[in-house]
C-alpha cells in the first residue's frame, strides 16, 4: 500500500512539474497521432471509460488488458525494427545459453571497480499527457475515495481459484529455485533429490514403519511362547506348575487385610465321670448341734471337674 502510494504520488508530482508543451510539440503530436494508434504508449480508447469500470466490471478489465497486450506487442515490434540491421548478433545471442549470458555479465561486473558501476540512465522521451492525466485521476481517487486497486483485483472471480499460485508459476514459466547469480557463485539446482525435505520425510517414514513392524513382531513372539502347547505328559506337569504358581502369586498378592486372624487354641477341661454306689439315705448335718437333718437321694452320678 505504501509503495503504491509513493509511486502514484511521484507520478503525480512528475505530471505537475512537467513543462507545458509548445505549439511545435503540439503539431508534432498531431502528426504522430496516427502512429500512436498503431503502437503508442496509450491508445485513445484508454480514457475516461476506464475509471467507470473500476467499480467491478470485469469485462472492462479484460478489454483493457487486451488493449494493453496489443499495444505492448506493437511497441515490441517497433523497438525491434532498428535491431533488424544486425541479424548475426541476434542469432548469436539466441544461440547462447541465458545462463552463460548471466555468467558473463556477472563476471564483467565483478571485475569492475565501484566507480565504474553506474545506474542506467532514464529512458528517453516523456509520457503522454493522456497517461499523466490518468495517473493523476487515479491518485486523486485513492486520496479522496480510498480506492484500493489491489482489493479490486483480488475481488475478481479469477483470483478465487485456490491453485492460482501454482497456475501463475506454470503460466509464466517461473523457476522458483532460480537465481541471477552465476553457477560458479551459487547453483540452486546443484543439490540432489535426497537433499530436499520431501525425500528426507519419505525416508524417515519408511524407517519408522520398519521399527513399528519389528516391535509388533517381537510382542507377538513373546505371547506365543507363553502359551505354547506341549505333549500330554508335559500338560499335567504344566497344569500343576501353573496351579502352584497361581496359588503362590495369590498368596504374594494378599495384603495384611486378607490374612486370617490367628486363633489360639484353649485347652478344654477334662470331664471325669465317677460312678459310686451310695447308701439310700444320706444324712447331712446342717449345724454343729445336729438338730436338723436333710434326706438326699443318693441314686445317680456325681460329676466332678478336674482341677486345672
UniProtKB/Swiss-Prot annotation:
Comp. bias regions, Acidic residues: 16-26, 57-78
Alphabetized InterPro entries for the sequence: SAP30BP
Domain of life per record: Eukaryota
Family annotation (Pfam families): HCNGP
Gene Ontology CC, one term: nucleus
Cross-link (Glycyl lysine isopeptide (Lys-Gly) (interchain with G-Cter in SUMO2)): 95, 220, 304-305
Biased composition (Basic and acidic residues): 79-99
Subcellular location: Nucleus
Induction: (Microbial infection) In fibroblasts by binding of HSV1.
Signal sequence region: none
Name the UniProt record assigns to this protein: SAP30-binding protein
